[in-house]
Regions:
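Glycine-rich phosphate-binding loop of ATP-grasp-fold ATP-dependent ligases
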Residues: 50, 54-59
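Glycine-enriched alpha-helix->loop->beta-strand junction motifs that scaffold or abut catalytic
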Residues: 37-39, 166-167
Length: 236
């Protein structure tokens, strides 16, 4: 991707919204934290993220001084000088209270991510023979499991079964981008719709299910989730 971006004179932007602390194996000898690979990277501090604030927030990181200055301009009305907008900008500063909270929570991020990986490994083990497909991670990469997402061709029935057992799940995300009303004008003409369908995207949207996973999740609770899935698998 970096070579492609360079060839076309484009910036490579990493979407790290759900990947705080994850690592990418660049080669057999080099692994890098996500957020250090592209020209810019964007992190979300929404409260449910691995590193979350008390409200909305986010961060852009870059090693490029020119881009850093541009982002600083955009975050506060395009100001270089107070009350003078050199470029169209926004009010998107992270307030000091949110920043202070994030600094405290940052100390615990590695431990929380380690706990998430332990819980995910237990799910992997317990669900190996169940009716779901578990996440895969390329060798050498380090996942942080903001979500633990399985796939099932009986997703809706499985979700209903888990709900009946008092187990909350979620679907991330039920409507693919290309089917969102905001982007209908990009859709192909009716005569070409079937040929231009994003079949794998639509299949994934119909199958994905996020199971409970967070650092404070107890092993006993996780085992109960896995047992309920095994019970469902035995019934179909």
């Amino acid at each position: 991707l970096r070579a492609l971006a360079k060839r076309h004179g484009a910036w490579l932007i990493e979407d790290c919204a759900q990947a705080h602390g994850a690592r990418f194996l660049q080669s057999s000898e080099i692994d890098r934290p996500v957020g250090t690979i592209g020209d810019l990277a964007c992190f979300s501090f929404y409260p449910t993220k691995n590193l979350g604030a008390a409200g909305d927030g986010g961060m852009v990181v870059t090693h490029n001084a020119e881009l850093a200055e541009r982002v600083r301009l955009l975050r506060q009305y395009g100001w270089r000088e107070r009350y003078i907008s050199d470029v169209p900008g926004l009010n998107s500063r992270l307030d000091e209270l949110q920043a202070a909270l994030l600094r405290v929570k940052l100390r615990h991020l590695d431990d929380w991510n380690h706990r998430r990986r332990m819980l995910a490994a237990r799910y992997d083990e317990l669900l190996a023979d169940a009716c779901v497909t578990t996440p895969t991670v390329a060798p050498g990469n380090e996942h942080v499991y903001h979500l633990y997402v399985v796939r099932s061709q009986q997703r809706d029935a499985l979700q209903a079964h888990l709900a009946a057992h008092g187990i909350a799940t979620a679907i991330h995300y039920p409507v693919p981008v290309h089917q969102q009303p905001a982007y209908r004008h990009f859709a192909p003409p009716p005569t070409h719709q079937e040929a231009n369908r994003l079949i794998e995207t639509e299949r994934a949207a119909a199958e994905v299910l996020s199971l409970p996973l967070y650092p404070q999740l107890s092993t006993e609770h996780l085992d109960r989730v896995a047992a309920a899935i095994a019970q469902f698998a035995a019934s179909i």
